[in-house]
């Protein structure tokens, strides 16, 4: 028995059968176009050796396509009604593939490695606007085994995640996700392929974790780098010298640390790349040591 993907009619019938009404608070919009589903899964690069962490499986459109790739899937769904229905839907539309599916009824922001029997190698997620960035950063931090990420988010969030330094959309999320890997856009998704139809376009973003990280990845180092990113964008139009003055202890010390990191103190924080923030933290420690020696 081959896997049958869900269409618009089936999705609406499923929702009716279980007396389900989409909730705005959960950002519930379900893809019903098979071509879009195949495009997302193809762009994710998922294959049969992967263990995929799927966030927000909903009624199962993407889940079926991921299983069709031969992957093992752990689907995390916050809505108890949808989590309960998902195994039945998968069983009805496939055959032995149900044996490669695990469903958890849980808030993704509380998910930890200890909750999973096997650790994921890939993440595929349909993330609502209000939790997209926190959820993504949480999963990248807590699940280092995840090597590739494909997320579908509101177009505005996609633009922010993939923005380059100095651009109008570049900000805290843009810099922080690059701590983990390379980021690129994979196009737009029309509102018409969803039920219910959202008011905005969605965007696809892929993140590939660095094969070998250019910098330390421990939690303490990451937290210090992220603090610098937060400082820089709290008043993004300030010069770096002024933005980091309180952190460094004075404007002069801020300038000295920036110069030690080969950063022009007159540059605005919004132009700094993740490598600049990392270098600033690393060189500031060296600068402090030189002051103590003197």
Curated annotation (Swiss-Prot):
GO terms for molecular function: 16S rRNA (adenine(1518)-N(6)/adenine(1519)-N(6))-dimethyltransferase activity; RNA binding. S-adenosyl-L-methionine binds at residues 29, 31, 56, 77, 107, 126. It is found in: Cytoplasm. Gene3D superfamilies: Ribosomal RNA adenine dimethylase-like, domain 2 (1.10.8.100), Vaccinia Virus protein VP39 (3.40.50.150). Its EC number is 2.1.1.182. It is an enzyme of class 2 (transferase). It catalyses: adenosine(1518)/adenosine(1519) in 16S rRNA + 4 S-adenosyl-L-methionine = N(6)-dimethyladenosine(1518)/N(6)-dimethyladenosine(1519) in 16S rRNA + 4 S-adenosyl-L-homocysteine + 4 H(+). SUPFAM superfamilies: S-adenosyl-L-methionine-dependent methyltransferases. Its main location: cytoplasm. Coiled coil: none annotated. PROSITE patterns: RRNA_A_DIMETH, SAM_RNA_A_N6_MT. Keywords: Cytoplasm, Methyltransferase, RNA-binding, rRNA processing, S-adenosyl-L-methionine, Transferase. GO terms for cellular component: cytosol. CDD domains: AdoMet_MTases. Specifically dimethylates two adjacent adenosines (A1518 and A1519) in the loop of a conserved hairpin near the 3'-end of 16S rRNA in the 30S particle. May play a critical role in biogenesis of 30S subunits. Belongs to the class I-like SAM-binding methyltransferase superfamily. rRNA adenine N(6)-methyltransferase family. RsmA subfamily. NCBIfam families: ksgA. This is Ribosomal RNA small subunit methyltransferase A. The gene is rsmA.
């Amino acid at each position: 028995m081959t896997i049958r993907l869900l269409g618009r009619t089936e999705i609406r019938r499923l929702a009716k059968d279980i007396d389900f009404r989409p909730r705005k608070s959960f950002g519930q919009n379900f893809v019903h176009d098979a071509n879009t589903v195949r495009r997302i899964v193809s762009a994710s690069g998922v294959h049969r050796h992967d263990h995929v962490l799927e966030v927000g499986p909903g009624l199962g459109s993407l889940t079926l396509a991921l299983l069709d790739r031969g992957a093992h899937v752990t689907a995390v769904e916050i809505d108890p009604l949808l989590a309960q229905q998902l195994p039945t839907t998968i069983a009805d539309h496939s055959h032995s593939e149900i044996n490669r599916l695990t469903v958890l009824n849980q808030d993704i922001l509380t998910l930890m490695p200890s909750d999973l029997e096997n650790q994921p190698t890939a993440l595929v997620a349909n993330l609502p606007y209000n939790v997209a960035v926190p959820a993504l950063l949480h999963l990248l931090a807590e699940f280092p085994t995840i090597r590739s990420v494909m997320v579908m988010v509101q177009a505005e969030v996609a633009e922010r995640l993939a923005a380059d330094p100095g651009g109008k959309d570049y900000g805290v999320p843009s810099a922080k996700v690059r701590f983990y890997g390379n980021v690129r856009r994979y196009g737009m998704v029309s509102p018409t392929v969803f039920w219910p139809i959202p008011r905005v376009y969605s965007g696809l973003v892929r993140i590939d974790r660095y094969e070998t990280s250019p910098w330390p990845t421990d939690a303490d180092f990451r937290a210090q780098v992220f603090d610098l990113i937060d400082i820089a964008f709290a008043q993004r139009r300030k010069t770096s010298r002024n933005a980091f003055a309180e952190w460094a202890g004075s404007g002069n010390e801020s300038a000295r640390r920036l110069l030690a990191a080969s950063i022009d103190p007159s540059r605005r924080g919004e132009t700094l790349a993740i490598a600049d923030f990392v270098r600033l933290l690393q060189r500031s420690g060296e600068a402090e040591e030189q002051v103590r020696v003197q």
